[in-house]
Amino acid sequence: MPTLLELSSVLPLAELEVGQHFYWQIGNYRLHGQVFLTSWFVIAALVVLSLLANRNLQRIPSGLQNFMEYVLDFIRNLARTQIGEKEYRPWVPFIGTLFLFIFLSNWSGALIPWKLIKLPSGELAAPTSDINTTVALALLTSLAYFYAGFSRKGLGYFGNYVHPTPVMLPFKILEDFTKPLSLSFRLFGNILADELVVAVLVLLVPLFVPLPAMILGLFTSAIQALIFATLAASYIGEAVEEHGEEHAE
């Protein structure tokens, strides 16, 4: 009698395909090559921006240095508000990386004509319009807040699951599964829907009518990056917060 593992290798339990894909075959694994290509582009753009902003540091910032310091202050304030005054500093790089990567990924889908770049198969698109990217970001967030809780409280972190009453245990466990699901599908759905709407409008009315939708897409993309980073910081704040302790104002 075949085992469950053997059946799952023959009959996939679930398969999600949206659009055409460019695959890289590495052994028995098949990777979404177009996601890696666009993700590397976004990462390279962030590295170049960071190097340019730090190339000639001045005591009184101006130009790109001034802009990057403003972004850093914004991310620092976001982390402080959600995590708390005592614990936020170690998490600023993580929250900042999430926000900047998602923000630039979303905007790359709205501003860069990826589909004009021809591939052997499939087509390029924003990294965050692929469910694999958003699920990976959500799982990283889950690992981050688990690590934050354990590093702060040790085994006492499990006390959160039965606070304020043991009746909450199944709901707390369910919450650990729904958090990454909601994070990943919210981001994936919004960015993919925006790209599809703009693509359809461009095909139907290829002149100026799609412009308002594209501008709205830029705004939505920025909001989605902010929501993801805010929720990630909030989950970390919940993990490190002691019972009865409130975030600093």
UniProtKB/Swiss-Prot annotation:
Keywords: ATP synthesis, CF(0), Hydrogen ion transport, Ion transport, Membrane, Thylakoid, Transmembrane, Transmembrane helix, Transport
Disulfide bonds: none
Pfam families attached to this UniProt entry: ATP-synt_A
Entry-linked Gene3D superfamilies: ATP synthase, F0 complex, subunit A
Predominant cellular place of this UniProt entry's protein: membrane
Domain of life: Bacteria
Subcellular location: Cellular thylakoid membrane
TM regions (residue ranges): 33-53, 92-112, 131-151, 196-216, 217-237
GO molecular function list: proton-transporting ATP synthase activity, rotational mechanism
Membrane topology listed for this record: Multi-pass membrane protein
Any one GO cellular component localisation term in the record: proton-transporting ATP synthase complex
Subunit structure comment from the entry: F-type ATPases have 2 components, CF(1) - the catalytic core - and CF(0) - the membrane proton channel. CF(1) has five subunits: alpha(3), beta(3), gamma(1), delta(1), epsilon(1). CF(0) has four main subunits: a, b, b' and c.
Family recorded in the similarity comment: Belongs to the ATPase A chain family.
Role played: Key component of the proton channel; it plays a direct role in the translocation of protons across the membrane.
Listed name of the protein: ATP synthase subunit a
Lineage, top ranks: Bacteria, Bacillati, Cyanobacteriota, Cyanophyceae, Synechococcales
